[in-house]
Amino acid sequence: MTFFILFFIIFIPNSHVWAFDMDYDGHIATGSQYIFDSPPSHKDFDSELHVHLEFDGNILKKNELTLDYEIETALNLIDGPSVQSNLRPEEDIYLPRTWLRLSNDFFQFRVGRQEILFGDGVIFQPLGLFETRDVSGVVPESLGVDSFRATWFLSDVSLLETWLVPAKIGTALIPGIRADFLLGEFETGVVFQYHPKSDLEDFSGYEREMIQMGYHIKGEREVGFWNESRLDIEMEPSSPVQFDTVFGTDYTFEIGKGLHILMEYFLSTQQKEFSTSDLKGQRTYHHIGFSMDQPIDIEIKWQIYSLYDFLDKSFQIIPQIEYSITDDLFLYFHGKIGGDINGNKTNGRLYQRTNSFSGTESSIGLTVANYF
């Protein structure tokens, strides 16, 4: 990153270039949730304090070129069964994003810890190659990945983007490329990535060597609709494949201040030789997900997520009510209802109740968040 800064200082003319400034924002959130039927010798309450700070601004400006930056830092303090079961550390200080970007109207080059996110899936995201966000969480947060990314804006409706991500095993790199464009009236994108074995444990499939390719397409005809798919080809032992796809639709009904309903169907299937990470060793499974949200007035908004596994009959229902105390201070009432229609509580994909805390147990909680 130091080399990156020095390069642009040297090669961009110095007259009227320096334009360093800084802005900041962030939020503090604290809350606790009561775990129904917490595992034996585990605490009943899972509590968290989360502090998030973001600094951004410009470093250099020359004609149409801008060199800017963003630094995000976060602190988590956790207590409860998620710590006792080693799902989360008791204390965690980390940098979700730290990057430099050189850009103009036609291109941008960005280096550092950054988000690499694309695709149209909302609940299920086959193209979330570097996605860690829980969209049903109170304050969803996506971690960045250390990388170099270059984007060319070919027109107002099309772009070409490439990236390199250190795999953290020797000198191995994860290279990828994607293109977004309009296909008639449909927003369309394609992606290709080579994925060597890596130490990036925050992301799925890190232990496999794969070629990954996919597409997404989105349109609107009274209702919104989209499809997003990914094909993984494992390099060993005989190039077996895994295919993930999601079909989604949404519509806002003119009920009250607008009732938004979204539905997605997700299918994952793989050949026998593909390295499976499913707890049951099942090669094919499919989920359906719903979300509904509606503002009641300026101060109150409710939402609910519902997920169901057709194969093992497990489910999750995640309601939340947001109450705006002021423009910057919010109160969240949230819960989680997990279960299994077949009565199997030990190894569902969406619900598990065992002697160890899994994070899928039913709960009810309260969180306060202050944004600044």
Segments predicted by a language model, with ranges:
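Signature for the C-terminal beta-barrel architecture of outer-membrane proteins
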Residues: D21-Y24, L60, E64-T66, D105-F106, ...
